[in-house]
């Protein structure tokens, strides 16, 4: 059997770190078993649709090297590749309608005849009686014939407790309280997530569904629908939340969470981001900290994913990034730095910039650090004249005399090929002899212009 996994984001905004980690785990499971990694766009929530979000999702996955086998094409998402499309849910309406009609014919679904006002009356009554509102308590005895423009609801056939084996969490179970007659097709003719993802996963022959632990509570109603449709569920794996640095809540924007796009613009390498995200909730049981994508594919398994939330630590990401920067060849690093050089370096000679980069490589933590670490290689340093004017001995020299001393000093220092304390000391002694100046004058000037 071919292992087939899917990542199914919604184009409703930027793709946050939790989603990207899910995409990574989904990708690794497929690649570890020489399987297929599917990208499906769940775009049925048109009210929250954000223009350009899909393109950003595709570009993020591409930058991280999470190449997909089926789904929208990178340069033109409207074009798709794969034998199980369409891969946009809004293009799969006919498929959902076919399944909906099948369910109606089998007595598994019914048209919802109630107005929102009528439903609110039901809710208010349940609240007044201090009981949970359940739609199944208000099933119409003779529902109208369903047609587009009317919501269609699942008629849950059996109210019972469900148990299942989760590939990450182990044995789980949840009871009847989660089961109700949920909507399959909305009034706008588009399916709900609860319905569409089950149909899509079945039609696309998905074998593993990897998603966040927030979906555990809804799993019984999914299992109820699988059972009603006589579909064998795929292997389910619910991964823990990424937690805020405090460790007591889910990571959010208020905790400094950024999008992958923001981290990319700050000079985080894709290798470091993958390395970091993989270890947010997973380890291979060793002390190894640096993992290439190939090593992750080789070593990753769902049974090594932890059950509890993983604490977000941005400083660790930055540390990993520094390690990856130091591992790159000079040519590779140079090619990645093109948009990060300071303005003063834009027109500098390439060979000179590479020499500068070689000196800075071990000190870079992010590519964004490049300008502040290298700017002085491209601009003449400004001499603080106030320091000179405040020195009693240097005030005795004219501007021309100071410039001549600096010129001679520079010439002598440029002759040094082996920079050691001894060679520097010898150079300074030679300068004293050449210029005839006292140490107090010459060394004070050298200290000021090199500080």
Label the predicted regions.
Residues 5-11, 38-43, 204-209, 258, ...:
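Glycine- and acidic
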Residues 15-17, 263-271, 307-313, 346-356, ...:
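Structural motif
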Residues 446:
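Hydrophobic, well-ordered secondary-structure elements that form the walls
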Residues 52, 56, 95-98, 217-221, ...:
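Generic recognition of stable, solvent-exposed alpha-helical segments in well-folded globular domains
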Residues 86-90, 185-186, 204-216, 243-276, ...:
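Conserved phosphate-binding loops in nucleotide/dinucleotide-binding enzymes
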Residues 102, 109-238, 244-251, 259, ...:
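Active-site cores that bind ATP or allylic diphosphates and position pyrophosphate for catalysis
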Residues 330-435:
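Small-residue-rich helix-loop
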Residues 1-128, 217-231:
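N-terminal Rossmann-like or analogous alpha/beta NTP/dinucleotide-binding catalytic cores
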């Amino acid at each position: 059997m071919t292992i087939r996994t899917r990542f199914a984001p919604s184009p409703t905004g930027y793709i946050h770190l939790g989603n990207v980690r899910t995409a990574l785990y989904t990708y690794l499971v497929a690649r570890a078993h020489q399987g297929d990694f599917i990208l499906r766009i769940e775009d049925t929530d048109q009210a929250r649709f954000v223009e350009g979000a899909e393109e950003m999702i595709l570009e993020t996955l591409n930058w991280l090297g999470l190449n997909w086998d089926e789904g929208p094409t990178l340069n033109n998402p409207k074009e798709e590749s794969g034998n199980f499309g369409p891969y946009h849910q809004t293009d799969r309406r006919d498929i959902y309608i076919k399944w909906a009609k099948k369910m109606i014919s089998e007595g598994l679904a019914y048209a919802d005849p109630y107005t929102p006002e009528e439903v609110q009356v039901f809710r208010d009554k349940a609240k007044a009686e201090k009981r949970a509102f359940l739609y199944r308590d208000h099933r119409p005895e003779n529902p109208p014939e369903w047609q587009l423009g009317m919501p269609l609801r699942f008629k849950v056939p059996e109210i019972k407790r469900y148990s299942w084996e989760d590939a990450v969490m182990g044995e789980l179970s949840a009871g009847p309280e989660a089961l109700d007659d949920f909507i399959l097709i909305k009034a706008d003719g588009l399916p709900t997530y609860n319905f569409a993802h089950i149909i899509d996963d079945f039609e696309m022959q998905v074998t593993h569904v990897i998603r966040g632990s927030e979906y555990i509570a809804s799993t019984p109603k999914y299992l109820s629908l699988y059972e009603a449709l006589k579909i064998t569920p795929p292997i389910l794996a619910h991964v823990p939340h990424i937690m805020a640095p405090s460790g007591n809540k889910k990571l959010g924007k208020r905790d400094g969470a950024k999008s992958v796009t923001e981290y990319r613009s700050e000079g985080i390498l894709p290798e470091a981001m993958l390395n970091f995200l993989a270890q947010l909730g997973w380890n291979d049981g060793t002390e190894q900290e640096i993992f290439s994508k190939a090593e992750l594919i080789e070593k990753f398994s769902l049974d090594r994913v932890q059950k509890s939330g993983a604490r977000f630590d941005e400083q660790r990401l930055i540390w990993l990034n520094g390690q990856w920067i130091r591992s790159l060849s000079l040519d590779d690093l140079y090619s990645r730095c093109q948009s990060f050089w300071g303005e003063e370096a834009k027109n500098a000679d390439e060979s000179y910039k590479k020499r500068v980069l070689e000196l800075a490589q071990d000190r870079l933590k992010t590519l964004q650090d490049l300008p502040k670490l290298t700017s002085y290689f491209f601009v003449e340093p400004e001499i603080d004249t106030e320091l000179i004017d405040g020195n009693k001995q240097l005030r005795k020299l004219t501007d021309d005399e100071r410039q001549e001393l600096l010129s001679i000093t520079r010439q002598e220092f440029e002759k040094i090929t082996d920079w050691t304390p001894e060679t520097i000391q010898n150079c300074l002694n030679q300068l004293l002899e050449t210029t005839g100046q006292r140490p107090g004058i010459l060394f004070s000037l050298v200290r000021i212009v090199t500080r």
